């Protein structure tokens, strides 16, 4: 959620082999210009550079569940990053939701949706219908 959504992307992209999926809700990810301005470009905290690096190295990026309320203050930046992910071949499930801002009401709903979306790998997985729809 918010800065944690940014953190989820950073951890998932720095260690893609450790994660089955990445969930980011209203992720506080700046634009590429902001990354450069803040001296983050192409470093371990640059979500754009990490995607480019993983693609260049042939690493499989985990599927990403990426959502944002359409009235969120981060909407434009989130849309920009979602487009960047798609352009770079990331398996992204994009969930824009009208009527929500940067708020817990949205995150509570989206966390539940994410848990329904993510592939189960535990002992009970065989008993559950597997699906990845939203």
Model regions: which residues?
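Non-catalytic cap/lid and distal C-terminal segments of serine-dependent acyl enzymes
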Residues: 1-134
């Amino acid at each position: 959620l918010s800065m944690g959504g940014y953190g989820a992307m950073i951890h998932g992209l720095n260690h893609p082999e450790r994660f089955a999926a990445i969930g980011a809700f209203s992720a506080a990810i700046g634009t590429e210009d902001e990354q450069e301005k803040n001296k983050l470009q192409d470093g371990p905290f640059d979500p754009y550079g990490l995607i480019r690096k993983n693609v260049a190295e042939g690493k499989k990026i985990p599927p990403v569940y990426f959502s944002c309320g359409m009235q969120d203050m981060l909407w434009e930046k989130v849309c920009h990053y979602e487009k960047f992910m798609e352009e770079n071949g990331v398996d992204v499930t994009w969930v824009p939701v009208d009527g929500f801002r940067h708020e817990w009401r949205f995150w509570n709903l989206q966390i539940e949706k994410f848990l329904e979306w993510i592939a189960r790998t535990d002992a009970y997985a065989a008993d559950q219908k597997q699906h990845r729809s939203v």
